[in-house]
Structures are given as C-alpha cells and as structure tokens.
Amino acid sequence: MEVHWVCMSAATLLVCYIFGSKFVRNLNGWYYDVKLRRKEHPLPPGDMGWPLIGDLLSFIKDFSSGHPDSFINNLVLKYGRSGIYKTHLFGNPSIIVCEPQMCRRVLTDDVNFKLGYPKSIKELARCRPMIDVSNAEHRLFRRLITSPIVGHKALAMYLERLEEIVINSLEELSSMKHPVELLKEMKKVSFKAIVHVFMGSSNQDIIKKIGSSFTDLYNGMFSIPINVPGFTFHKALEARKKLAKIVQPVVDERRLMIENGPQEGSQRKDLIDILLEVKDENGRKLEDEDISDLLIGLLFAGHESTATSLMWSITYLTQHPHILKKAKEEQEEITRTRFSSQKQLSLKEIKQMVYLSQVIDETLRCANIAFATFREATADVNINGYIIPKGWRVLIWARAIHMDSEYYPNPEEFNPSRWDDYNAKAGTFLPFGAGSRLCPGADLAKLEISIFLHYFLRNYRLERINPECHVTSLPVSKPTDNCLAKVIKVSCA
C-alpha cells in the first residue's frame, strides 16, 4: 500500500513538473502575443524561450558544443523554412532573419533599422560618434575616419610595413622550440598591423599593453552584463578603462605635435591625426573620450576578426593538401615571373592571386567569424507579412545562409573552387555585412591575410598538435586549444 502511494505521488509530481515547466516556458511567448495582439501583422513563428533569459541557454549549448547550426536548424524543423523567426536572446526580444533578400533589406534600410548590439557589446565597444548620430553624420564620420584604409592608393602605403611584420613574425614563430597557440600568435600579428595603420606606431610597449587588455575586453562581448567583481563583464569594463588610459597619452602627444606644426619627414595622416582634426556638422571637434572610443572600437574590430580568419585559412589549407598545393603553386608563379630587381610584393601581384582570394572567401564562408549582424527596428516594419516591432533587435543570421545547401552545394565542404565564375546572389555572402555600414576594413583585412598566406605558403608549414581538437563557436568559431601547433620552416625561397 505504501509503495503504491509513493509511486502515485511520484507520478503526480512528475506530471505537475512537466505541465508546470511547459506553462512557465510559454509565458514569454504569451506575454508578447498579448502585448502585440492589436498590430496589423503577426509576429513570425518561433520560440521566445524562458522568462528573463529567453532562449539564451539553447544558444550557449549549441554554440559551445561545436554544433552552432543546430540553433537555426531546430527553428526550421519546428516552424518551417520561413526565413524569419522570433526569439529572445541577449536580454532582448529579437527577430532572426536568415533568408538572403530579407537580410539585405534589413542591412540596407537605414531609415527603419539602426545598429542594435546587445548591452554588453554596447557598453564595451561604445562609439558614440559612429552610433548615436544621424545617418548624414554617420556617413561623414565614416568617410573621414576610414580614408586611411580605403582605396588602392591608401593600401599601397602599408605594403612594405605589413610585409616586414609578417616576415619577422613567421621567422620568430618557426624558431620557437615549443608549440604555440596559433590564434594568439595571429592576434599579435594582426594587432601590430592595425596599430601601425591606425596609430602610426611600432612601439612594442604600447602594442603589448593594448593587446593584453583587448583579450579581456573581447571575452566580455557576449557575457551577461553584470558589473560586479568576479563576472566576465566587470573584468572587460576594467580592461576598457585601462585601454583608455593607454590610448590617451598617445593622443595627447599627437595633438602637441600638430600644434607645433608639421615635422620634418612627416608623411601620411593616420587615424589619430584625422580624429583630432575632424568636426561634426555644428563645427565642434571630437571630445577626447570620443576619440578614445573610436580608436578602441576600430582597433578591436580591425584585428580580432582578421586574426581568426588567418588562423582558419591556415588550418583549412593544412587540412586539404591538394588545395594547399594549388595555392602554393600560384604564389610561386607570381614570384617567378616578377622582375629580378623587385624584392617585395606589389598590389598588382596581390590582384593576380585569384585562387588565394577564393581560399580567403571560402574561409570567410565556412568559418563564419561573426555568426550574425545586429540591428534594431526604429519603427514597426512588415517583412513578408510578419511584423518586426519597433525597439526589437534584428539578428541577420549570415551563418545560416553561408551553410545553406540551396546557395552553396555541399556547404560543409571547404572548396575554394566553388568560387570559379561564381557570382553570389545578393544577400548570400555577408562576411562583412552590407549597406552603408558595410565593414570599411574589408579590403585591409584581405590584404593582411593575402600577404601572410603568400609568405606562409612559400616557406612554411603547420603541424597541429591536436588536429581533432573540439571546436567551439562561442564567442567566435575556434579550436578549444586555440590551434596549438608548430610553425615549421621548409624553404628559404
């Protein structure tokens, strides 16, 4: 009798738990359905997740387990291939768009959509002169501050120094007796390059100080925004304060140099020079805090993604010997046909690297360094009969498009030759976004990667220590050992 009573009680508790969990799980969805019931159009299909945390746990589970595509695939399996879904991520009700035309529409509509990053990213990468301004001001600032990195003439000025950084870095890596974390080393290379481009500095002390703080800053980008000691977000905020203190003396020194007049032998203007001179539409110069914000934001954006792309391009080439062989032959042909008096790369030669360019594009497609781009609706918007409510975040989920067999046959396969005579349809290739906020550093990033791969392919090879290492995609796609490997010199070509 007692056993029967215990079994009945346990069964009752189990049923109550299941129905109770389901009830609580649906509260978020019911709340927004009721709140928006008077709107002309319905919300897209989807899952709003648990109260307060939304669907964040599922996102973290899928992206940290090495199966990031499961998050979108589960939505497609449950709600069909609509290309637009509702969810609740990073503390905000959100709409995911993962169909090319819809993605392009959101990215190119500056009237109804603005930048809409999660709170953690907003706080850590704040950049008022580029975010909290009108579209006209944004275009002005963008044109001015990106002038050092846009156009062949501008990029040509960095070739010699970038080559020097790459050659010295590869030589140093190959001389190390112990394995290195390739991702960390690529961050060092990329950071040296971007500091030179934006700040005109080769000061190793500054580079080291800034680089160490950026690691903590980056780790907090998708963290829970709790500013309490012990939390990742708090550590990231402290790192940002350190960065501001490091950058400010550099700005002060440059301001003094400008006030004292042009120096003998001074050449191009770098980003600091431009930021100290630029004025807004009311004729006001930027505050020091704004200059610091812009420098930190651009330095961050300009090296993290490039370094990760570099690491993956080397990894993919190493995993596919036939692709590596073809890429190497192209680079050797370029050096074989140059004039004997020419010792360095030229932009003309980089333009001739057709197959290497395909390797880079395929790396960007497969690695999906940024899984999504963030926007916020500034008005109620109707897309395909569904409403995107004003104030909701919009996640342009490029990863889902890049890994969709409808646009890329055998999407899991690393195949640079897929780009032969291939014209990507609008919205199907979005590694740098689209529209007026298209990443201005795209050409610079490709230039850095091309130079590095040129010298790596000709003279070095990679020997991974854990080739089957687990891959996590949180916050970006990378092996959990940061690609522990040896860089081995194989030639003196």
Swiss-Prot record:
Saccharomyces cerevisiae expressing Glycyrrhiza uralensis CYP88D6 and CYP72A154, combined with the expression of Arabidopsis thaliana beta-amyrin synthase (beta-AS) and NADPH-cytochrome P450 reductase 1 (ATR1), accumulates glycyrrhetinic acid (GA) and, to lower levels, beta-amyrin; these GA production was increased in the presence of G.uralensis cytochrome b5 (GuCYB5). It is found in: Membrane. Its main location: membrane. The chain crosses the membrane at residues 7-23. It comes from the Eukaryota. Coiled coil: none annotated. One of its GO terms (cellular component) is membrane. Disulfide bonds: none annotated. GO terms for biological process: brassinosteroid biosynthetic process; brassinosteroid homeostasis; sterol metabolic process. It is a single-pass membrane protein. This is Beta-amyrin 11-oxidase. Belongs to the cytochrome P450 family. GO terms for molecular function: beta-amyrin 11-oxidase activity; ent-kaurenoic acid monooxygenase activity; heme binding; iron ion binding. It comes from Glycyrrhiza uralensis (Chinese licorice). Its cofactor is heme. PANTHER family: CYTOCHROME P450 26 (PTHR24286), CYTOCHROME P450 88D6 (PTHR24286:SF199).
